[in-house]
């Protein structure tokens, strides 16, 4: 398929630049991946969509204040986006500047330009920076960094974004973007789900460039995802196996949860069969139409950008035509799109695990 096949008209006014006052009050478009039937609800109706014994799989990564502003020692302005913390002093980062900075360039970062970092290497699209500071990297970022809001919000970050651009269950710092499907869950809704008997487990995928990088090839099959760190612990594997054995559904909260679970599938020796196993490491899995899902039965997700890898994953799960019919209806009914926007609940039940 061609990247252009995943285009659609997204009016700028439908991009939600700010979150709703209450997380769980967004609209919810429910899509049957088999029939293509569409229903319109509010997000709290997810309680009616889930049954006793169903399993929700959340991504508990936490967004770090990864954006630093400053200048080169020579004077040119720079914007640094830290993607990977390598150790207490070194990071991999993206750097925006009028001219590509060279190795050994000294950067003066932070609002007071009192944070010193030197460029020591280049790795593909990232620069390796060495910070000259008594504090560790996460402390520096918490003190001086900005929340890296997506570019399409077209606004600076505010202090409230440090809380609002996080899921209420975020635990492990490391992401440069929120797993946005999870933003709709508040503690009251989570409690109501537990009372109903819906089970919950947590994977970790530190959302990075891989999730949102633009596709620069014409055919999607030629696209390569940059890797992201993920963990699928044995507790998740055990919960998925138990859920399947009792005939319930595994429901992924967000495309990053899908990609983590599917990355944990391994082949059984001397067999055509596969199994889910604990996984800890890098994943560059790219899911697009034609992919055979092995774990999930339903998906909660936001509305995504045209020509993006998340909309390709959704199209693989719900079917290309069903997905774009739903997106056209969402646009016509003025649903709110992207990170702070509305949500979808998609059923399919086609996993083969």
Swiss-Prot record:
What's an example Gene Ontology biological process for this entry?
Answer: tRNA wobble guanine modification
**Which pathway is it part of?**
tRNA modification; tRNA-queuosine biosynthesis
Task: Note the InterPro entries from the entry.
Answer: QueA, QueA_dom1, QueA_dom2, QueA_sf
What EC number(s) does this enzyme carry?
A: 2.4.99.17
Under catalytic activity, the entry for this protein gives: 7-aminomethyl-7-carbaguanosine(34) in tRNA + S-adenosyl-L-methionine = epoxyqueuosine(34) in tRNA + adenine + L-methionine + 2 H(+)
Show the GO MF annotations.
S-adenosylmethionine:tRNA ribosyltransferase-isomerase activity
State a GO cellular component annotated for this protein: cytoplasm
UniProt keyword terms in alphabetical order: Cytoplasm, Queuosine biosynthesis, S-adenosyl-L-methionine, Transferase
Predominant location? cytoplasm
Q: Does the keyword Flavoprotein apply?
A: no
List locations, semicolon-separated.
Cytoplasm
Instruction: Look at the named UniProt entry and state the broad enzyme category this protein falls under.
Output: transferase
Its annotated function is as follows: Transfers and isomerizes the ribose moiety from AdoMet to the 7-aminomethyl group of 7-deazaguanine (preQ1-tRNA) to give epoxyqueuosine (oQ-tRNA).
Describe, as the record does, how this protein assembles with itself and its partners: Monomer.
Q: What family does the database annotate?
A: Belongs to the QueA family.
This chain belongs to which protein, by name? S-adenosylmethionine:tRNA ribosyltransferase-isomerase
Organism phylogeny: Bacteria, Pseudomonadati, Pseudomonadota, Gammaproteobacteria, Candidatus Palibaumannia
């Amino acid at each position: 398929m061609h990247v252009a096949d995943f285009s659609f008209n997204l009016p700028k006014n439908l991009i939600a630049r700010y979150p709703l006052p209450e997380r769980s009050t967004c609209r919810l478009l429910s899509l049957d991946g088999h029939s293509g039937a569409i229903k319109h609800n509010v997000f709290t109706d997810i309680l009616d969509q889930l049954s006793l014994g169903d399993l929700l799989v959340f991504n508990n990564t936490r967004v770090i204040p990864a954006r630093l502003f400053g200048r080169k020692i020579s004077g040119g302005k720079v914007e640094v986006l830290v993607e990977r913390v390598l150790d207490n002093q070194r990071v991999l980062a993206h750097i925006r500047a009028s001219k590509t900075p060279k190795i050994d360039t000294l950067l003066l970062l932070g609002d007071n330009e009192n944070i010193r970092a030197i460029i020591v290497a280049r790795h593909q699209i990232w620069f390796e920076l060495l910070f000259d500071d008594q504090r560790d990297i996460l402390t520096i970022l918490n003190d001086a960094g900005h929340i890296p809001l997506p570019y399409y919000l077209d606004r600076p970050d505010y202090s409230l974004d440090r809380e609002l651009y996080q899921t209420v269950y975020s635990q492990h710092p490391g992401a440069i973007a929120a797993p946005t499907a999870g933003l709709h869950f508040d503690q009251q809704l989570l409690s109501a789900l537990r009372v109903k008997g819906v089970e919950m487990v947590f994977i970790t995928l530190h959302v990075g460039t891989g999730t949102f990088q633009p596709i620069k090839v014409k055919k999607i099959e030629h696209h390569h995802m940059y890797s992201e760190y993920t963990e699928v612990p044995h507790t998740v594997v055990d919960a998925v196996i138990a859920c399947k054995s009792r005939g319930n559904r595994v429901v992924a909260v967000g495309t990053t949860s899908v990609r983590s679970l599917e990355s944990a599938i391994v082949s059984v020796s001397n067999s055509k069969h596969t199994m889910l196993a604990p996984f800890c490491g890098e994943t560059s899995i790219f899911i697009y139409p034609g992919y055979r899902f092995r774990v999930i039965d339903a998906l909660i997700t936001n509305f995504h950008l045209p020509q993006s890898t998340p909309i390709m994953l959704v199209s693989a799960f719900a079917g290309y035509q069903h997905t774009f019919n739903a997106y056209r209806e969402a646009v016509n009914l003025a649903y709110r799109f992207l990170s702070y926007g509305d949500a979808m609940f998609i059923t399919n039940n086609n996993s083969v695990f």
